[in-house]
Amino acid sequence: MTELLFNKRLQVLVKSKDTDERRSVIRVSIELQLPSSPVHRKDLVVRLTDDTDLYFLYNLIISEEDFQSLKVQQGLLIDFTSFPQKFIDLLEQCICEQDKESPRFLLQLSSSSSAFDHSPSNLNIVETNAFKHLTHLSLKLLPGSDTDIKKYLASCLSSVKEEKQQLQQKLRKTEEDLTRQLNYAQQTLSEKSRELDKLRSEWTSQTTSLSSRHMQDLTAEREKALETQSRLQQQNEQLRQELESSHHRSTQQLQTKVSELETANRELIDKKYKSDSTIRDLKAKLTSLEEECQRSKQQVLSLRRENSALDSECHEKERLLNQLQTRVAVLEQEIKDKDQLVLRTKEVLEATQQQKNSVEGNAESKQLQISKLESTVKSLSEELIKANGIIKKLQADLKALLGKIKVKNSVTVPQEKILQETSDKLQRQQRELQDTQQRLSLKEEEAAKLKEQLEATVQKLDESREVLKTNENVITWLNKQLNENQLSRKQETVAMFETPAAALRSAAVPHNMAFPITSTINSKYPLALSCVSSGSRSVLTSSNGPKVQFNPMSVKPSAAEVSPAAFSQPANKENSEPVGLDSKYFERRDDSIPLRGLLPSMHLNREVPKPLNTAAAKATPSAFFPG
């Protein structure tokens, strides 16, 4: 039995005797032959093949005895059991490094002959470092004989046949699956087509029934819309007047607030300018004081340096004076000694004079000694006089230095006082500057808050103006829709009921007829819809059709007139489109502005009809209620 451990393609550097080096891709396979009986041992088989050249075959069988000799020859440190895994690890490193320009691990196949015919070749695993090419392992492979090549080709052929059989079996299975799926899809398609035919027939029947039912519902809804139209108009007029008055009051209040805020802002700006000017003055004073302080500090430093130099000179003079005083003391001691010696010599002289008669021979020598001593005494007295003169000069210099030091101290003391006063003034100015800066920051915060309030009020005012503009646009659009609906209803009634009585009734349309206007506007500040009013803001004017004129307070006066000829469209009789307002304008929304008293009155009017409206409908003929 054999166990395949490694089978991969690697780039190999091929070397021969008389040819250049080249790189080729060679398949390296490592197999472990397991023994059939416990007596035999395991063998490791290394095989080199080329997928493009089927006759390229090199084999190497390594037994445990061969590995021991290989271990001794190449200095290996592993056993036979761990050798295959280490060999595979080296090959994996060669695979990782083979795509690089300068691979660290390289697989070499070298032959001693000029071509790879039937001579053995060496397979080397070489590591390239900065010092040398290090060969980790070198295996001597033998070329395969004819029988080996035939066995290898036979094994390749058998493996190819097995793969072919497996692929054929997979192909049969896939064909069977696809045919089964195709049959199932065809069956489902036929079933779905039958269901589709049934659904089409049902749909045609349902559409016919729904169209007839829809026509009946449309006629009923038209009648209800005409009833609610006249009822809602009066409520909308009242609501519009209330909303306009509230808008007028709110705009006046906002304008007064804006004027107050502007005056406060101007006062704050004036205060800010004044504080800025005071800050500039204080800063200028501060800079001047700082400059004076710097100058005084520099003067103090220079005076301190001069004082230190004078102190050092004074110390040197005192040291010299002490040295001279010690020398004078020594000389005085010597003079005293000499005086004592002179006294002694006088005594000796007296004794000698007394002994003159007895010692005449030694008189000359004694006189010589006396003359010598007198000369030494004279020299000592002269030196003493010179030392006294030097001491007097040093004392005079010391007095002059002490006077200079006193003058310097008298100059530096007032300068230090001035410096202390300037530093105190500077500290006071800094404290005042900090206080003014704090007051300025408070004023700036107050100004920022007032600016924010002003911006908020201006923003609210702009938004209210935008809402008023949108309300105006909605009113104009609704009036256009109502005009178009009325014209289409007129055309339908004229086409369906064209009789003399109907003509008389269509001629007697009231001119002061009003139209319902409802709207829900989603905005950040919900404001009521400004609808059409009577008087200067009347909804309806002369006979050509309903016209709307809306003049809010915050917008420039503009008249939005809508003529029925410009926006009239022919009624779609085939589809029977509903005429009047869309149902979305009658729906209740959570974010809408509630119309005061509208919904309860609508509910009551649905339950109990008003006698005034019915009487008016019966008394006055109208184009909306023919016949």
Swiss-Prot record:
- Where does the protein end up? Cytoplasm, Cytoskeleton, Microtubule organizing center, Centrosome
Keyword Cytoplasm listed? The answer is yes
Q: Which Pfam families match?
A: SAS-6_N, Sas6_CC
Q: Where is the composition biased (Polar residues)?
A: 202-213
Q: Region (Disordered): which ranges?
A: 187-257, 561-586
Disulfide cross-links: none
Q: Does the keyword Cell cycle apply?
A: yes
Q: What is this protein called?
A: Spindle assembly abnormal protein 6 homolog
